[in-house]
């Protein structure tokens, strides 16, 4: 039974799921908007929003925290110095999920996940 289960498995091992979320986060930070399956987008939303909330402080510890999760210098600098300051007065809700289509090959629901413009 799935009662009170805290996250989506996404059909992957825990390390594969962590790598997937990390790579999707790097992609959304660099591009601002990506298309993925709806369950991945819903799982990614919480991951990205926690990073943005920590990055809003902008200090050394924020850089360390974000880099520990992303392992990408370029994405870390973009998130802490460019993206997070835009949301300084916003309490959460940094991302938006828009359902787009049903993928032809496997009938998976697709969605855009994007950073909300300020």
Curated annotation (Swiss-Prot):
Record bears the keyword Ribosomal protein? yes
UniProt-listed Pfam families: Ribosomal_L17
Q: Which family is annotated?
A: Belongs to the bacterial ribosomal protein bL17 family.
Q: Looking at the keywords, is Ribonucleoprotein present?
A: yes
Which keywords accompany this UniProt record? Ribonucleoprotein, Ribosomal protein
Q: Please provide one cellular component term from the Gene Ontology annotations of this protein.
A: cytosolic large ribosomal subunit
Q: Name one GO biological process term.
A: translation
Q: How does it assemble?
A: Part of the 50S ribosomal subunit. Contacts protein L32.
Source organism of the structure: Campylobacter fetus subsp. fetus (strain 82-40)
Q: Name one GO molecular function term.
A: structural constituent of ribosome
The protein depicted here goes by the name Large ribosomal subunit protein bL17
């Amino acid at each position: 039974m799935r009662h009170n289960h805290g996250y989506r498995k996404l059909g992957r091992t825990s390390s594969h799921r962590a790598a997937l979320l990390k790579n999707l986060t790097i992609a959304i930070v660099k591009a601002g908007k990506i298309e993925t399956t709806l369950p991945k987008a819903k799982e990614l939303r919480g991951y990205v929003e926690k990073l943005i909330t920590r990055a809003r402080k902008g200090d050394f510890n924020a850089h360390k925290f974000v880099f520990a999760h992303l392992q990408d210098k370029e994405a870390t600098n973009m998130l802490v110095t460019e993206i997070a300051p835009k949301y300084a007065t916003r309490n959460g809700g940094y991302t938006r999920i828009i359902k787009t289509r049903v993928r032809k090959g496997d009938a998976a629901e697709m969605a855009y996940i994007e950073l909300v413009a300020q």
